[in-house]
Swiss-Prot record:
Component of the ERMES/MDM complex, which serves as a molecular tether to connect the endoplasmic reticulum (ER) and mitochondria. Components of this complex are involved in the control of mitochondrial shape and protein biogenesis, and function in nonvesicular lipid trafficking between the ER and mitochondria. The mdm12-mmm1 subcomplex functions in the major beta-barrel assembly pathway that is responsible for biogenesis of all outer membrane beta-barrel proteins, and acts in a late step after the SAM complex. GO terms for biological process: aminophospholipid transport; intermembrane phospholipid transfer; mitochondrial genome maintenance; mitochondrial membrane organization; mitochondrion-endoplasmic reticulum membrane tethering; protein insertion into mitochondrial outer membrane. InterPro entries: Mmm1, MMM1_dom, SMP_LBD. GO terms for molecular function: lipid binding. The keyword RNA-binding does not apply. This is Maintenance of mitochondrial morphology protein 1. It is a single-pass type I membrane protein. The gene is mmm1. The SMP-LTD domain is a barrel-like domain that can bind various types of glycerophospholipids in its interior and mediate their transfer between two adjacent bilayers. Residues 42-63 have a biased composition (Polar residues).
């Protein structure tokens, strides 16, 4: 027969209750009712013994500068290797891109033909760009056809930029076989012995039948001072463009397809394209800023009360 010491059960019960109360107290004291760590302390980097804390007072602007790191405007070489290996990546066919361009071009032609908006725009450009108004009368665009073919992009490659090895450029071949034609009517002015002494009717039709070339696309990053980023497009100097120019001069006795007029029109078209689109020249497309600036936000807020008051009236 085993004899238990008296009071063992009572002592165990008391000790167990005390331990339970102690655990509950620790949990409530250090997990529920403790004061949170300040965000400035939590977000600040750990300082070593050799570093001295900054004694300048913090402002919201300075906090933003510490919180947001300045994004990269160019890709680092190791990032480029992860995204695209310029040395081993095979050229792409761009079949999917051709389908998207074809759909966009269909809509563009439809919009251009609506109410002859493209015809009027071209007429304005031709009259504005006429160099010698004393020899040529007002230019009228009689007919304009944007064709029914589609450009084919192929053999796309991504290469380092020629002037900046840390940036990339995309090169692709483009070919277009179509019948894009424009017919203009004007008058040649004879200014002797007096201004506009006689006029000579002139009708010119220009057809673009084929174009083959290499297009280069690269980006110009923003400088952060209000200047947007740009997408630049340029063509290689070794391009091929096939033109057909027909001319008709005179009212009654008409002269057709004068070689000198054909050569002059072809050289002017090639010169216009070279001076604007052929490397080192390029065309730029501004990339819109998706993040509104404080000035734009303030402008929107200033107009909001006026709109509400007008609606109430």
């Amino acid at each position: 027969m085993i004899h238990l010491p008296q009071g063992s059960f009572t002592q165990g019960l008391i000790v167990g209750q005390l331990l339970t109360l102690a655990i509950i107290y620790v949990f409530l004291r250090f997990f529920l009712f403790c004061s949170p760590i300040p965000k400035s302390v939590a977000n600040s980097p750990k300082q070593t013994g050799n570093e001295t804390p900054d004694e300048t007072p913090s402002t919201p602007l300075s906090n933003n500068k510490k919180r947001y790191k300045k994004p990269l405007t160019i890709l680092e070489p190791h990032i480029l290797n992860l995204l695209y290996d310029v040395n081993e990546h095979e050229p792409e066919s761009l079949d999917w891109f051709n389908v998207l361009i074809a759909q966009a071009l269909i809509q563009f032609r439809y919009d251009a033909c609506s109410n002859d908006v493209a015809l009027r725009k071209l007429e304005t450009v031709l009259n504005k760009g006429a160099q010698d108004k004393s020899m040529v009368d007002h230019i009228y665009v009689r007919d304009l056809s944007l064709g029914d073919g589609f450009p084919v992009f192929s053999h796309c490659r991504v290469l380092p930029h020629q002037h900046n090895s840390s940036q990339l450029r995309a090169e692709m071949l483009v070919s277009l076989t179509d019948n894009i034609n424009c017919t203009v009517d004007t008058k040649l002015l004879l200014n002797f012995p007096k201004p506009a002494f006689a006029t000579l009717p002139l009708s010119i039709t220009v057809r673009i039948c084929k174009f083959v070339g290499k297009i280069m696309i690269y980006f110009s990053p923003s400088n952060g001072a209000g200047q947007p980023a740009y997408m630049n497009l340029s063509f290689d100097p070794n391009f091929v463009i096939s033109l057909q120019v027909s001319s008709l001069v005179g009212a009654r006795s008409k002269l057709q397809d004068i070689p000198k007029i054909t050569q002059l029109i072809e050289s002017r078209i090639r010169q216009w394209f070279t001076n604007r689109c052929v490397s080192p020249q390029f065309q730029q497309i501004a990339i819109p800023n998706l993040w509104p600036t404080s000035a734009k936000e303030g402008h929107a807020r200033s107009h909001a009360p006026q709109e509400e008051s007008s609606n109430e009236d």
